[in-house]
């Protein structure tokens, strides 16, 4: 096959590499509706991008490849089962080219941790290929491609804080007047998003009396974010999936309790879990609480983070000027 037929990138793709940093997310509010006919659940959520970043580098290559290093790297597939791989194929298909890139991902976001690390990496691949190949695909089209890949991928492009509706892919920017400080507690294992959603369906079908009432309007959360006051935000944090995550991984109750005992304003399971996120009064308080939590024996590791931060962005190349 020659380069002239448009199916290879060899004669017109710039050489080199592009690196993109992309954040994980915490769901400050996650209202899960009933299961829809298409298998998805209707969601209303407040996404919040935090400073736990994966770094994704995309290079020109003879064929598509994928490698990981860092957090949970050994457990991740390096083929079409990986969302980052599928993102490369989708972008290439969108512009009529072969996906001839080598993808290297340095993981910091936990795998299967409820922080959308896989979605973040997919978003980063879209941004990196758009830059590497000098495509000029507009942000609106990148968002549409992201939505084809998964519900959380558009927010990884968007970043900041956003209200998500539909299955989470329809986004509206949320005004946030402050930097919020978090302690993130990683669990020894992961939780399957599909299994957590199935568990909340089961608990609801059985009318489990331990289930808390479903969340109401997100408006108080949005008002607290606009105020910039973590003490106002703390009692409003909520996650309809948390009872399902606790049902599948009861040890998370100890983690949540330990974070509050250490002085966090509030704690909740992030998304489908099992990562637990603790809101703190300040950066200094987050360091102290993280230190206490790390020594409590209730989680695998602890990270301190802040938000909101921007979504997937190209890392500027180092200056070569003398």
From Swiss-Prot:
InterPro entries: GHMP_kinase_C_dom (IPR013750), GHMP_kinase_C_sf (IPR036554), GHMP_kinase_N_dom (IPR006204), IspE (IPR004424), Ribosomal_Su5_D2-typ_SF (IPR020568), Ribsml_uS5_D2-typ_fold_subgr (IPR014721). Keywords: ATP-binding, Isoprene biosynthesis, Kinase, Nucleotide-binding, Transferase. Transmembrane segments: none annotated. It catalyses: 4-CDP-2-C-methyl-D-erythritol + ATP = 4-CDP-2-C-methyl-D-erythritol 2-phosphate + ADP + H(+). Its EC number is 2.7.1.148. Pathway: Isoprenoid biosynthesis; isopentenyl diphosphate biosynthesis via DXP pathway; isopentenyl diphosphate from 1-deoxy-D-xylulose 5-phosphate: step 3/6. ATP binds at residues 110-120. The active site is at 25, 152. GO terms for molecular function: 4-(cytidine 5'-diphospho)-2-C-methyl-D-erythritol kinase activity; ATP binding. GO terms for biological process: isopentenyl diphosphate biosynthetic process, methylerythritol 4-phosphate pathway; terpenoid biosynthetic process. Disulfide bonds: none annotated. It comes from the Bacteria. Belongs to the GHMP kinase family. IspE subfamily. Catalyzes the phosphorylation of the position 2 hydroxy group of 4-diphosphocytidyl-2C-methyl-D-erythritol. This is 4-diphosphocytidyl-2-C-methyl-D-erythritol kinase. It comes from Mycolicibacterium gilvum (strain PYR-GCK) (Mycobacterium gilvum (strain PYR-GCK)). The lineage of its organism: Bacteria, Bacillati, Actinomycetota, Actinomycetes, Mycobacteriales.
């Amino acid at each position: 096959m020659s380069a002239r037929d448009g199916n290879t990138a060899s004669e017109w793709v710039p050489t080199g590499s592009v690196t993109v940093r992309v954040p994980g997310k915490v769901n400050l509010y996650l209202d899960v509706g009933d299961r829809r006919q298409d298998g998805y659940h209707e969601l209303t959520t407040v996404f919040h991008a935090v400073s736990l970043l994966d770094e994704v580098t995309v290079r020109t290559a003879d064929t598509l490849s994928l490698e990981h290093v860092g957090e949970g790297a050994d457990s991740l597939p390096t083929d079409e089962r990986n969302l980052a791989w599928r993102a490369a194929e989708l972008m290439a298909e969108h512009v009529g080219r072969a996906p001839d890139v080598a993808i290297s991902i340095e993981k910091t976001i936990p795998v299967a941790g409820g922080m959308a690390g896989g979605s973040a990496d997919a978003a980063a691949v879209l941004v990196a290929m758009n830059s590497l190949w000098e495509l000029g695909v507009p942000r609106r089209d990148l968002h549409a491609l992201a939505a084809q890949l998964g519900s959380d991928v558009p927010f990884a492009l968007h970043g900041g804080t956003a209200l998500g509706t539909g299955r989470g892919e329809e986004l509206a920017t949320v005004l946030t007047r402050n930097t919020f400080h978090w302690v993130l507690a990683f669990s020894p294992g992961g939780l399957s998003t599909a299994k957590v959603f199935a568990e909340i369906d089961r608990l609801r079908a059985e009318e489990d009396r331990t289930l808390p009432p479903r969340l109401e309007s997100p408006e108080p959360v949005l008002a607290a974010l606009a105020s910039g006051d973590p003490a106002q935000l703390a009692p409003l944090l909520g996650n309809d999936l948390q009872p399902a995550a606790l049902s599948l991984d009861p040890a998370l109750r100890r983690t949540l309790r330990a974070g509050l005992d250490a002085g966090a304003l509030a704690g909740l399971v992030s998304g489908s879990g099992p990562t637990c996120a603790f809101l703190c009064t300040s950066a200094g308080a987050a360091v102290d609480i993280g230190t206490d939590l790390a020594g409590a024996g209730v989680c695998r590791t602890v990270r301190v983070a802040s938000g909101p931060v921007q979504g997937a962005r190209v890392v500027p190349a180092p200056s070569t000027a003398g």
